């Protein structure tokens, strides 16, 4: 099966939307305080937040059985910098981003996923509207309906 994964993030929250056919599932979460992760998840930039959203979006999608083993996931990037990091699989100077890439690669390997990265115009990012306040009520803040 094929999916499109849209994601966005800022210093307070991150969101992701998984589109499978005509069905779109939207989720949004607040970043936990940094002390809960021993300082490892001290989000300092929107780019870091987007990498968290990408990692959590894939992990969550697998956990609620929307994304399954051997599925193809079209990762919809609205940041050229992030897109370049992902397609080149290059190290950055940001440990949080490098850790997220490592965890994403682990998920891909363990579940035999095929990721295909796409660079898109930010106005086409359907996950962005949940952070902007325009459509906050359409994204779920929990997984109760999926488990």
Regions found by a protein language model. Give the residues of each.
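Short, low-complexity, polar/charged sequence segments that are solvent-exposed and flexible
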Residues: 23-26, 93-96, 134-139
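Basic, amphipathic N-terminal segments that precede the first structured/catalytic domain
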Residues: 1-13, 124, 133-136, 147
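Acidic helix/loop or adjacent segment enriched in Glu/Asp that either coordinates divalent metal
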Residues: 28-75
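RNase H catalytic domain
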Residues: 55-133
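Extended, charge-rich low-complexity interaction segments
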Residues: 141-147
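RNase H-like nuclease fold core
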Residues: 1-48
């Amino acid at each position: 099966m094929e999916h499109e994964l849209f994601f966005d993030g800022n210093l307070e929250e991150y969101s992701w939307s998984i589109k499978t056919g005509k069905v779109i599932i939207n989720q949004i979460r607040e970043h936990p305080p940094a002390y809960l992760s021993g300082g490892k998840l001290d989000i300092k930039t929107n780019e870091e937040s987007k990498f968290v959203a990408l990692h959590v979006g894939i992990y969550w999608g697998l956990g609620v059985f929307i994304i399954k083993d051997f599925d193809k996931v079209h990762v919809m990037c609205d940041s050229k910098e992030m897109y370049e990091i992902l397609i080149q699989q290059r190290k950055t100077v940001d440990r949080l981003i490098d850790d997220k890439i490592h965890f994403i690669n682990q998920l891909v390997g363990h579940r035999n996923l095929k990721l295909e990265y796409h660079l898109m115009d930010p106005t086409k990012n359907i996950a962005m509207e949940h952070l902007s306040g325009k459509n906050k009520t359409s994204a779920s803040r929990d997984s109760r309906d999926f488990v």
